[in-house]
Swiss-Prot record:
Protein name: RNA silencing suppressor
Zinc finger (C4-type): 57-78
An example Gene Ontology molecular-function term: DNA binding
Family (UniProt): Belongs to the carlaviruses nucleic acid-binding protein family.
Originating species: Potato virus M (strain German)
Keyword annotations from UniProtKB, A to Z: DNA-binding, Host-virus interaction, Inhibition of host innate immune response by virus, Metal-binding, Suppressor of RNA silencing, Viral immunoevasion, Zinc, Zinc-finger
GO biological process: regulation of DNA-templated transcription; symbiont-mediated suppression of host innate immune response
Length: 108
């Protein structure tokens, strides 16, 4: 939400300098449609850090370090299984901001 507001202010400022009109509602809707800024926690380091924080493998989303019952993960050449926990995968890949619904989605 904070990134959307920053982008909306930048768009509104650019609109004001180019056309002379300041319409924040239009700039905010453009910023919402633009999506996430570049980077945004999607690096390999960030994925590995989030996976370690919940004791999962960053490649296949299984428990790491493996137990006696989890033999398919070697943390180098593993792939996700047929049915894996989508919420865990979403948290590892995109971070906590994508797992928790935003305030705008709750109102609709």
């Amino acid at each position: 939400m904070k990134d959307v507001t920053k982008v909306a202010l930048l768009i509104a400022r650019a609109m004001c300098t180019s056309s002379g009109t300041f319409v924040f509602e239009l700039a905010f809707s453009i910023a919402e449609c633009a999506g996430r800024p570049l980077g945004g926690g999607r690096s390999k380091y960030a994925r590995r850090r989030r996976a370690i924080s919940i004791a999962r493998c960053h490649r296949c989303y299984r428990l790491w370090p493996p137990t006696v019952f989890t033999t398919r993960c070697d943390n180098k050449y593993c792939v996700p299984g047929i049915s894996y926990n989508v919420r865990v995968a979403q948290f590892i890949d995109e971070g906590v901001t994508e797992v928790i619904p935003s305030v705008i989605n709750k109102r609709e």
